[in-house]
Amino acid sequence: MKLQVPRSSLKRSIFHKKRKELLSSLPKIEAKAVARYIRISPRKARAIANTIRGKSVEEAFQILAFSPKKAARIMEKVLKSAVANAENNFGLSVENLYVSECYVNDGPRMKRIWPRGRGRADIIQKRMSHITVVVRDRSKEDEYRKALEELEKKISSEE
């Protein structure tokens, strides 16, 4: 027995595939790096992430270098990785890069037992974080925006 697929969903899937192909033709202006399962509390890491968001890469490195926090060392490694990805994978120049996105998500928690008095025990949660840094090229944003507008016109004319 052959599975019947509704025509509307078939049309939509073809449209999305075509749109995805067209979007891949856009110029690459951003690179990303993710560090997962890092043994630091997300709350502590977010404090550092908030300080570098929106800053140029050079300024972000300076902020992280002078921060005494453990999260700053980790964030510095992730930022270095994102910059290397931008440089090597997409050929973006380091001088024009800025931190467009920087966020910290909760990872899994390790539960540990902490013995207390009178035979009781408390559970301590050792938290982990997933840290994501996205760097973007300021000089190519206008070019990207124009290409995106042209692409949207092309897609809307095909519908």
Swiss-Prot record:
GO-annotated cellular components: cytosolic large ribosomal subunit
Highest taxon of the lineage: Bacteria
InterPro entries hit by this protein: Ribosomal_uL22 (IPR001063), Ribosomal_uL22_bac/chlpt-type (IPR005727), Ribosomal_uL22_bac/org-type (IPR047867), Ribosomal_uL22_CS (IPR018260), Ribosomal_uL22_sf (IPR036394)
Keyword list, A-Z: Ribonucleoprotein, Ribosomal protein, RNA-binding, rRNA-binding
A biological process term (GO) from this entry: translation
Molecular function per GO: rRNA binding; structural constituent of ribosome
PROSITE patterns hit by this protein: RIBOSOMAL_L22
Cited function: This protein binds specifically to 23S rRNA; its binding is stimulated by other ribosomal proteins, e.g. L4, L17, and L20. It is important during the early stages of 50S assembly. It makes multiple contacts with different domains of the 23S rRNA in the assembled 50S subunit and ribosome.
Subunit and interaction comment: Part of the 50S ribosomal subunit.
Family: Belongs to the universal ribosomal protein uL22 family.
HAMAP family linked to this entry: Ribosomal_uL22_B
Protein name: Large ribosomal subunit protein uL22
Organism expressing this protein natively: Thermotoga sp. (strain RQ2)
